[in-house]
């Protein structure tokens, strides 16, 4: 007999066995596999003294063990060419294999598993490697692998026979659910007793993220459950019932003769004992109030609410009806859009029906700490707050992962189940295996739809698993799960919501032909215009492709007015898609949807908040949203994209005149005028300057009716500074942004490719020739050709030069120094001009300004600012006095003369 132990001893000899002479033969009964004696010829890959492999090696059937010499296996199977052999690797059910190992066989000395696999090898003429040393009842719940080597048709026969008895696809699943990380320790229980009891009762393995213990800044809410579908569903329900319920309220300041209750108050102790809750008092000295927390279990939620109401009545007496309670929960930031719904429809509906206030953190606010970005607060009456909390839990996403051994199935058939059940299905081919990993994602209140989708994918005849979902999870609209609602759920789960905040970049005629959720960026259009699912997005490639398409479209439009690409990495065939204007791209998270409603392709979180009228264009001026300076490409990634379209903006010569003020005068920002003059087609540029309307009028002077006075060269730095200030503004959720040409030619964009050479004779003087990396703003050149006789100093009025010499903020100062790429560093660290003057070289190093030249410029600027302040405080104010605080470019210079003012940096 060749038992499992003898087989292992043969395949993995120990040092003592290697020292012995080789055995001549083995006596095997006729009923067993006689060909097993030829296994002596198979070389052993285990080194002397290593012994048999560990259980882990046996479970995974490592390629480096008994599969190293494929020639020996081919010789044993009678195959002349080893290349004709085919290898198949797949999972089998662990529990079924354990039962088979424990079973007895009809052959003495062989267990059921040994006889099963030996019989398959003998009848199919294949070689099967299986974990014969599998530990029975091990803590690990992972399914082991089996490998088969042989000819293709024989391997398929052996695989079908093995899976008919040990198939795991109908039983083993992995569920990933969202549970507040603050509740994990409560669910686990003291010494892990609570979670152990759940795992034992449901025969599942529940895993909590290990990183939460070591990472103080980032926490994961994901909990994984592994086991049979019935066990996993039961474990999910028990985990939800085991979560803590924590309700808090503020105790108002009572009269001086009214003592404040505390934990030692007999009534408080009675409530704790009667309702099985824990009452915690937390004082807040700065607010002169006390916070009362009532903590209990979800399975006893009614008792927790009753205890809270009694405490409010006891502590607040006559004003108890006015006291509102708070409940906090953790929802992962990437799930906020799913929970809130399209255009926040779920959130608004819950708040309206429950009369509560639900606060989600602003994910775009860089002042919010990472841990606070998942914290959601619900305020209102006790029962209303609890109902709102339950409905938010019902909208949390749940993912179910399982294997699908048949990789020849039509993927489109599986993907068609998305809108049928309101789920989102993804497929992934497992490495070194012929199985597919299928992920079905849905919301927790509709988890039965996930189970139905799995049942249809696997074509199972077993009864449906009925989930235990509380009635509190459902909203009134959930009763009618129609096609539109299911399609909307699929779009939310896919992560690409087609809403006014995230407009589709495809034309409507084509968007309707793709999928029910039109702007899914996980789809690519092939040459036939059909949508096919793709894998992981590659931001860099799509980013480059995006801008290349912009540049090609720009060149075509300059030469022949050709069509422009839509700029998205959804590649639309030219014959199908109508020409679209390239949208402005803001540099944000790669391949992500954020709260401001942008798809973006970089890591910066800055954006342009305000709407700015465009500059007027002169004849022969080339304008492009992708124009940039050669030097700015090495600076920080800023790309201004305005929030609103420029209404009534004068580009060219036909627009209507009139003033258009900005929406935010309270911010100290005044949007300029966009005047259009019909005669020559030259428009006065619109300027954005800080301050009041008076400063705006004094700054925008008019020199003898010069129609181009708004486009002075000295406005350039100021406009660039204002552009960088605008990019630092926090976006407002819900406001639709449309690209404009307001900042064209300012060199603010560092995300665009180098500009194409200008055509001969096309703004050649202003552009500096084809080799120049600059595209100057419209009207920057002198309209009268006086540059040879009059310098810029003489052409600029004194009051204008004084305005330019005064730096009112850090953005203007850094722009004048040519260090605008450091603006973000100073803004993030909340450094204004007052703090700037106190910085030292060590402080600049700590801020990350490593360039020596940049530090020297900044230190010189600090010294000059301090000198100017000292001079202004000591010298008497006189209109004719000249001191070190004189403005930049003050005085008059002869044509061609060089002036170096005292405060030149």
Curated annotation (Swiss-Prot):
Transmembrane segments: none annotated. GO terms for biological process: actin cytoskeleton organization; follicle cell of egg chamber migration; microtubule cytoskeleton organization; mitotic cell cycle; negative regulation of oskar mRNA translation; oogenesis. Gene3D superfamilies: 3.30.310.270, Transcription Factor, Ets-1. Coiled coil: none annotated. Residues 646-660 have a biased composition (Gly residues). Abundantly expressed in ovaries and early embryos. Residues 559-660, 751-772, 874-905 are annotated as: Disordered. Residues 805-868 form the SAM domain. Residues 172-239, 324-392 form the KH domain. It comes from the Eukaryota. One of its GO terms (molecular function) is mRNA binding. Residues 592-611, 874-892 have a biased composition (Low complexity). Residues 559-569, 630-645 have a biased composition (Polar residues). The modification Phosphoserine is found at residues 557, 586, 639, 642, 646, 666, 692, 695. Keywords: Developmental protein, Differentiation, Oogenesis, Phosphoprotein, Repeat, RNA-binding. RNA-binding protein that is involved in oogenesis. Required for correct targeting of the migrating anterior follicle cells and the establishment of anterior-posterior polarity in the oocyte. May act as translational repressor of oskar during oogenesis. Function seems to be sensitive to small changes in expression. This is Protein bicaudal C. It comes from Drosophila melanogaster. The gene is BicC.
């Amino acid at each position: 007999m060749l038992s499992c132990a003898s087989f292992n001893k043969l395949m993995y000899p120990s040092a003592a066995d290697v020292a012995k002479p080789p055995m001549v033969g083995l006596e095997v009964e006729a009923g067993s596999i006689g060909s097993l004696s030829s296994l002596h010829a198979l070389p052993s890959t285990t080194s002397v003294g290593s012994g048999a492999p560990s259980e882990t090696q046996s479970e995974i059937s490592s390629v480096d063990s008994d599969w190293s010499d494929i020639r020996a296996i081919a010789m044993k199977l009678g195959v002349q060419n080893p290349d004709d052999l085919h290898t198949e690797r797949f999972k089998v059910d662990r529990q079924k294999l354990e039962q088979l190992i424990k079973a007895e066989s009809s052959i003495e000395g062989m267990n059921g598993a040994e006889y099963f696999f030996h019989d398959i090898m003998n009848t199919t003429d294949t070689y099967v490697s299986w974990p014969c040393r599998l530990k029975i009842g091990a803590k690990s719940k992972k399914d082991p692998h089996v490998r088969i080597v042989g000819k293709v048709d024989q391997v398929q026969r052996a695989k079908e026979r093995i899976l008919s008895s040990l198939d795991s696809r109908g039983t083993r699943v992995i569920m990933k659910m969202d549970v507040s990380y603050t509740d994990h320790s409560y669910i686990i229980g003291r010494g892990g007793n609570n979670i152990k009891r759940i795992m034992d009762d449901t025969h599942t393995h529940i895993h909590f993220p290990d990183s939460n213990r070591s990472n103080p800044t980032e926490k994961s809410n994901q909990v994984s459950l592994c086991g049979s579908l019935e066990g996993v569903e039961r474990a999910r329900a028990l985990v939800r019932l085991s979560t803590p319920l924590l309700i808090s309220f503020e105790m108002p300041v009572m009269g001086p003769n009214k003592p404040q209750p505390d934990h030692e108050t007999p009534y408080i102790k009675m409530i704790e004992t009667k309702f099985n809750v824990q009452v915690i008092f937390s004082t807040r000295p700065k607010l002169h109030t006390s916070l009362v927390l009532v903590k209990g279990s979800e399975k006893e939620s009614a008792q927790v609410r009753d205890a809270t109401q009694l405490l409010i009545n006891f502590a607040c007496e006559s004003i108890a009806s006015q006291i509102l309670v708070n409940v906090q929960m953790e929802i992962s930031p990437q799930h906020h859009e799913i929970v809130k719904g399209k255009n926040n429809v779920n959130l608004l509906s819950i708040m309206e029906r429950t009369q509560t206030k639900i606060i989600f953190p602003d994910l775009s606010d860089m002042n919010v700490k990472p841990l606070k970005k998942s914290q959601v607060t619900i305020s209102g009456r006790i029962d209303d707050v609890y109902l709102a909390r339950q409905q938010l839990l019902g909208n949390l996403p749940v993912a179910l992962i399982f294997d699908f051994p048949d990789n020849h199935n039509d993927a489109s058939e599986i993907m068609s189940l998305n809108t049928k059940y309101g789920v989102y299905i993804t497929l992934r081919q497992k490495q070194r295996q012929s199985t597919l990993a299928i992920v079905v994602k849905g919301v927790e209140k509709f988890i039965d739809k996930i189970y139905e989708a799995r049942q249809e994918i696997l074509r199972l005849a077993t009864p449906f698993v009925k989930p235990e979902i509380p009635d509190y999870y459902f909203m009134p609209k959930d009763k009618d799960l129609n096609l539109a609602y299911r399609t909307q759920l699929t779009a939310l789960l896919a992560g690409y919501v087609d809403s006014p905040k995230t407009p589709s970049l495809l034309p409507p005629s084509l968007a309707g032909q793709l999928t029910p959720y039109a702007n899914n960026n996980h789809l690519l259009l092939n040459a036939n215009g059909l949508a096919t699912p793709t894998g992981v997005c590659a931001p860099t490639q799509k980013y480059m492709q995006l801008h290349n398409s912009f540049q090609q479209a720009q060149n075509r439009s300059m030469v022949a007015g050709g069509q422009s690409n839509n700029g998205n990495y959804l590649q639309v065939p030219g014959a199908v898609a109508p020409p679209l204007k390239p949208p402005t791209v803001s540099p944000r998270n790669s391949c992500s949807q954020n709260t401001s409603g942008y798809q973006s392709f970089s890591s910066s979180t800055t954006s342009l908040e305000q709407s700015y009228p465009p500059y007027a264009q002169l004849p022969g001026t080339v304008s492009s949203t992708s124009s940039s300076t050669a030097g700015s490409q090495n600076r920080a990634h800023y790309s201004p994209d305005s929030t609103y379209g420029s209404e009534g903006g004068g580009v060219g010569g036909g627009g209507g005149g009139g003033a258009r003020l900005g929406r935010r005068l309270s911010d100290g920002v005044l949007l300029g005028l966009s005047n259009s003059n019909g005669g020559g087609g030259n428009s006065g540029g619109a300027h954005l300057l800080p301050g009041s309307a008076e400063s705006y009028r004094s700054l925008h002077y008019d020199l003898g009716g010069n129609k181009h006075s708004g486009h002075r060269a000295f406005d350039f730095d100021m406009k660039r500074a204002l552009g960088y200030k605008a990019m630092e503004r926090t976006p407002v959720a819900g406001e639709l942004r449309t690209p404009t040409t307001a900042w064209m030619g300012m060199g603010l964009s560092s995300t665009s490719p180098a500009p194409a050479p200008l055509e001969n004779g096309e703004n050649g003087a202003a552009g500096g020739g084809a080799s120049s990396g600059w595209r100057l703003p419209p009207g920057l050149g002198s309209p009268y050709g006086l540059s040879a006789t009059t310098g810029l100093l003489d052409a600029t009025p004194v009051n204008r030069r004084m305005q330019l010499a005064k730096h009112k903020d850090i953005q203007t100062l850094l722009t004048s120094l040519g260090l605008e790429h450091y603006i973000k560093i100073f803004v993030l660290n909340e450094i204004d001009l007052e703090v700037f003057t106190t910085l030292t070289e060590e402080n600049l190093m700590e801020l990350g300004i490593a360039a020596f030249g940049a530090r020297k410029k900044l230190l010189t600027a600090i010294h000059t600012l301090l000198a100017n302040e000292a001079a202004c405080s000591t010298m008497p104010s006189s209109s004719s006095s000249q001191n070190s605080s004189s403005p930049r470019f003050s005085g008059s210079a002869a044509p061609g003369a060089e002036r170096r003012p005292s405060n030149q940096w």
